[in-house]
Amino acid sequence: MLLSLIFPIAVLGEKFDGYGPTAFDVSLSPDIPLGELTGYGKKHFKERENKGFGDLSLVDFNMETEDSFDRSKLVDIGWDLLDSSHGTVMTVQSIRKGEADALSMKVLGHYEVLNLSEGSSNVQEAPITYLPIVFDTLVLDHKKSGYIRDPENDKIIYASWAMFEHKKTKRWFTVVNVDMYSAYSEKTDVQMASILKDMSKEHTIDSNPVFFMGRINAVSDKLQKVIDDKYTNPLDVDRNAKEAPRFTMKNLPDILGNFQRDFVLVRDAASQMVRVNYARILRRGIPTLHYPIHAIVSFETGDKQLTPPAA
């Protein structure tokens, strides 16, 4: 009885109504009632006025702030993003231990937070930060997860990952939560090469879709070519986002240069099973240094997309 009070149990016959845009999407009409755009964090089966869509709602949120910012607000901002996006997966960067613990308590219900056992600091004496992955337990089964360490300093964790199975479609996929904060593209190239090497060792990861989510601060020409050749940026697919500004940090050089430093990237070359339905940089009412990214995707059907067995 107590468990049912803490963890809502799906009622037989309840119908999931799909995903949709958030209250943080500046392109939405202000006439849309706020109630249509919020309330999904606690009510997984909340009915939508307009039909939802997609199999996964993916959100990336970097909690990096200016020194003067009141960080006590961050957990509520993170929850509001999850509540409005009905996130299936939310990746978070630059979150500290107390904030991570508070977020874990805030999302109790049909969400769980992974990869909080280990953190690291990017500079000496800086606060230790974590790379958690929040996921919806009513939609996904968690299979395994872990960390990726800096090849030049194993005390530094610059990525965490988690493998999931989508309960309805039985599709397997991996989420990699990255924080490549270095301003040197040569460093980023080494880190990305290390991630790709690790993934290639695991058949189940390498042969199924991978979602890279998080910060890539410096993108070299070499890395950009890899991204262009092997990955899909959902913002390039959604026609309503394609021509919109791409900057994801609130500083003048980034705005003038239109630099995207926060990403959701899809690697799907082997299986060709992911279809992008929607993608946005969320700018409405976001007070932090980074604008979150939101993407909704679907899994295509067909025998050729059946999940290969683990090697």
Swiss-Prot record:
Glycans are attached at residue 115. Its main location: secreted. InterPro entries: Endo/exonu/phosph_ase_sf. Residues 1-13 form the signal peptide. It comes from the Eukaryota. One of its GO terms (cellular component) is extracellular region. It is found in: Secreted. The keyword Glycoprotein applies. Keywords: Glycoprotein, Secreted, Signal. Gene3D superfamilies: Endonuclease/exonuclease/phosphatase. This is Uncharacterized protein ECU07_0920.
